[in-house]
């Protein structure tokens, strides 16, 4: 497991403990002796939101009790995406947890008043398990790299089944995830989001490459556009696994939409190839993990939707990732990808 804190912002955890203790006391009227312990940032994961783990202790009805918790704070200066979907993230997690169709942590409290911690935040239950971290890459070192082929196979299948389960969630009642009037849902919504993203980073020298990428994709518009919920950052690294390599929880719902079923599958297979596929660019090849074709076949079997035209959605995934990389370049001051490499990635020169 990585020892590196990758949070976009950090704060004094003793001060946070004091503020949250008082805040929780007002929300737990039956509790006394409220105390927070073991506050810490996740290691090797959690780059988009400031996320802090802690254990909540209290006394209620004469009994000592405790609950593992996570506080997730809305991004401030370090904003990776142009759309503020923090409220939608919380509401979707609440809906998914209530339905039980996808393994999502329970949101216990949601605070919209920024005066408490400087920005809105929510507190959810802390699940116990292990995360395939990005830093260092899970395929190179750590528990996934050290697992047996059979264990990795179990992990891969469990992950794909949860990915597919998202596409069995009815969209009724999720209208709060809709986009603007001209692109309320479906591919139009997800497309509109990234057209606006490219415009958001228009002053970057990579912007002409991104625009060319959009033009290429538009000229090849896919026929297959199955409806479905978009998780967003759909990858093994945003799932937690237990000692049996089964999925405990699906995490990081920060960019949801009603944009269609194939975006998450495309993102998942693209990241899988990058992290642990035969041509892994960031991680290393891991035997035991299912191939792209096996992933697509299992996903179709579980969710019952067609993955036709997936190649287009994979190319769109590369455009999305390039947008994110350009924004991170602006935030960090270091070019995430050479421009020539971006042109090759987006197939525009």
Where are these regions (language model features)?
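Juxta-kinase regulatory segment immediately upstream of eukaryotic protein kinase catalytic domains
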Residues: 1-36
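ATP-binding pocket architecture of kinase catalytic cores
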Residues: 40-210, 221-224
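Protein kinase-like catalytic core scaffold
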Residues: 69, 103, 122, 228, ...
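All-alpha amphipathic helical-bundle segments outside canonical DNA-binding/catalytic cores
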Residues: 178-182, 305-317
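Catalytic-loop of the protein kinase fold
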Residues: 229-231, 236
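Activation of the activation-loop gatekeeper triad in protein kinase-fold domains
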Residues: 251-256
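Active-site activation/catalytic loop segments of kinase-like enzymes and analogous catalytic loops
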Residues: 263-304, 317-334
């Amino acid at each position: 497991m990585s020892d590196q804190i990758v949070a976009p912002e950090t704060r004094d955890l003793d001060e946070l403990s004091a503020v949250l203790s008082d805040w929780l006391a007002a929300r737990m009227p039956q509790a006394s002796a409220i105390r927070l312990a073991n506050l810490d940032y996740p290691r090797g994961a959690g780059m988009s939101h400031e996320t802090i783990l802690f254990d909540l202790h209290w006394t209620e009805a004469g009994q000592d009790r405790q609950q593992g918790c996570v506080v997730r704070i809305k991004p401030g200066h370090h904003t990776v995406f142009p759309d503020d979907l923090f409220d939608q993230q919380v509401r979707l997690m609440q809906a998914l947890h209530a339905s039980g169709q996808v393994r999502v942590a329970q949101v216990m409290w949601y605070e919209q008043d920024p005066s408490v911690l400087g920005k809105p935040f929510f507190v959810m239950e802390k699940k116990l398990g292990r995360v395939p971290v990005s830093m260092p890459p899970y395929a190179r070192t750590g528990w996934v790299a050290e697992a047996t082929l059979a264990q990795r196979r179990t992990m891969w299948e469990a992950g794909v089944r949860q990915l597919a389960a998202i596409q069995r969630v009815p969209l009724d009642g999720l209208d709060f995830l809709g986009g603007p009037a001209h692109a309320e849902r479906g591919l139009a919504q997800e497309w509109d989001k990234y057209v606006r993203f490219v415009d958001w980073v228009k002053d970057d020298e990579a912007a002409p490459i991104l625009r060319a990428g959009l033009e290429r994709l538009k000229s090849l518009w896919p026929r297959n556009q199955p409806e479905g919920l978009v998780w967003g950052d759909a990858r093994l690294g945003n799932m937690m696994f237990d000692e049996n390599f089964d999925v405990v929880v699906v995490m990081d719902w920060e960019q949801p939409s009603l944009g269609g079923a194939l975006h998450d599958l495309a993102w998942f297979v693209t990241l899988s190839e990058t992290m642990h596929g035969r041509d892994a660019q960031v991680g290393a090849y891991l035997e035991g993990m299912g191939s792209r074709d096996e992933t697509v076949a299992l996903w179709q079997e579980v969710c019952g939707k067609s993955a036709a035209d997936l190649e287009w959605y994979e190319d769109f995934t590369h455009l999305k990732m390039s947008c994110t990389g350009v924004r991170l370049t602006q935030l960090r001051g270091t070019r995430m990808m050479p421009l020539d490499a971006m042109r090759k990635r987006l197939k525009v020169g």
